[in-house]
C-alpha cells in the first residue's frame, strides 16, 4: 500500500510493484487514523510505503502520528519516506535492479477504491495487459499526445486518472509526465499558468472544478497549451466555451474507475458539441435504456449502459455489487443520446431529481446556473416537497466577498434564471456557500449537501477535501 503525496517516490513505488508482479494500492492523504486503519484492514498489505508529511497549500502537514496510530497491531512493515532526508533515495541507490516478473495479461496490477462520491468506496482491480493497451491508446488518440510532448494532469496519483494518465500512459508512449505536489491554484492561479508555460506542457488533463476555479480568478495567461481535456464531472457548455477561449481546445471525455480509460469522448479530430461528452470510442458499445434495459429513442433520458467496455476494463471488483446485468454494464449514470450518436451525461441515477413526472439530472440545473454571470460554482439536489421532490441549489458567488444583504436579491434572480431555462417546475430553493464539498478527486459530494439540508447522516466522508467549509445559507 502506498501512502505518499505527489512526489517522484510515489511513482517509483508503483512502478516497482508493477515490475516484480506485486499489486499496489494507493490511498489518499488526509485520512484520519480510523479511516486509514479500515482501509488497511480491508487491503491487508504486507508493506506500507508512507510519508511522514506532505504539503497542502504551502504548509507542511504531518501524518506520521496518524499512520502510527492506524497500524497499531497490524501485521505489516512500514517503509518511511522522511521529507528532507536522503535515506529513502540512498536505499534506492544501494538496491540491485530487479528482473521483471513475467505475469499473465490479466494478472492484477493495482487495486483502487472508487471515488465514493455517492457512497462507500468499492475496490476496483485492474490487470496488466488490457489496461496498458487501453490507457496508451487513449492518450495517443483521445488526448492526442505526440512524440516529444509534455503531458500534465492535475489529478493525484491515488485517483484512477493519476494512475492511467499521470503515470502509466505517458511512460508507455515515451512521453514526459509532469507531477505537481499541492493544489493546482497554489499559491495563485497565476503560478499555475506560469508552470504550464515554463515547463512546456502541451496537453493538460484536469477537472471541471479546476477550470471553474481558474475562471473565477479572472482571465487566463498564455501558456502554450495545445489541448485542455476535462474529466471527473460534467463539463458544462459555459465552462467548455471559457476553456476554448482562454486556455486551449477542450477535449471532453467520460469514464469510470472501473473502466480504466475513456469510453465516451470527443477527440480533437471530431466535431465538438459543448454539453455533450462525445461518441463511443472503438471497442465500446454504449446505449441509453429504460429500467428494463430496453433501448430508448434519441433525445430520451435513461440509464447509460455499455455492451462492450473497452480493453482497460477492470478484472475484478471487491466490496460492491456487480455492475453487469442482462449482459449490459450499468454505469449508474443518467444520459441522453442525440440523433448523431453524441451522449450527454446528466448525473448519477441515484441523484436524479424527480419533479412531478419529469426526471432532471443535477448537471442540467448546474449547467443553467453556470451561465449566470454571478455564479462561480453550483450544485443541485432533490429534496422532499409538497408534490414530490423540489430542486435545491447551492451556489458559490462569483464575487469572493458577496454582500450578505444582496444574497436574497441574487437568490430571486437565480430562481427566475432556472425557471426560464428549465420550464414549469416548482421554484427552487437557493442556498449560498463559500465552497462546495468535494472528494479529493474533484467530484461534488451532493449527498453531503442534501444530508446537511435535511439533517441526515451523510455516510462515509473520509474522501472529503480537507478545506471544505459549509459557508452560510440565506
Question: PLM features: what roles do these ranges have?
Answer:
Residues 47-105:
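ANL superfamily adenylate-forming
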Residues 44-48, 65-79, 150-152, 178, ...:
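Conserved helix-loop-beta element of the AMP-binding
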